[in-house]
Structures are given as structure tokens and as C-alpha cells.
Amino acid sequence: MPKMKTKSSAKKRFKLTGTGKVKGNVAFKRHCLSAKSQKMKRQARGTFMLFKTDSDNVKKYFLPNGG
């Protein structure tokens, strides 16, 4: 059976850290920013770590070869 391909959409959205955790971007920061509070915009900067259950699914189904 051939290797599973990495999903192209997941390659663009997630990165694997050295310890095997999955890092992603925070949502809700592209447009309509005037309606959002300063706190929400500030907290949406940078990246966040996925929870273990979510990261297990991402690694199994979307990044089988490590991204």
C-alpha cells in the first residue's frame, strides 16, 4: 500500500514542533476588525497549540508524513 499523501490545506495551516505538538494560527483576524474589541485582536496575534485530541487527528489524517 502506498504512503498517504499530506493534505495541501493542512500543510499551509499547521506546523509540527520539535516535540510533536501541532501549532496553528488564530482565527477571526482578517477582516471586519473595526467591530472586534482590542483585546480580541491582540489575543488573535501569533499562533496557538492544538489540544492533544485535535493534534492527534491532524497528525493521523492530514500530516501523516510530518507535514
Curated annotation (Swiss-Prot):
> Key word Ribonucleoprotein present in the record?
yes
Q: Name one GO biological process term.
A: translation
Q: Which Pfam families does this entry report, sorted A to Z?
A: Ribosomal_L35p
Q: Which PROSITE patterns match?
A: RIBOSOMAL_L35
Q: Name one GO cellular component term.
A: cytosolic large ribosomal subunit
Q: Which UniProt keywords apply?
A: Ribonucleoprotein, Ribosomal protein
**InterPro entries membership:** Ribosomal_bL35, Ribosomal_bL35-like, Ribosomal_bL35_CS, Ribosomal_bL35_sf
Q: Which GO terms describe its molecular function?
A: structural constituent of ribosome
Q: Which NCBIfam families match?
A: rpmI_bact (TIGR00001)
- Protein family according to the UniProt entry: Belongs to the bacterial ribosomal protein bL35 family.
Cross-referenced PANTHER family: 54S RIBOSOMAL PROTEIN BL35M (PTHR33343), LARGE RIBOSOMAL SUBUNIT PROTEIN BL35M (PTHR33343:SF1)
Q: What is the name of this protein?
A: Large ribosomal subunit protein bL35
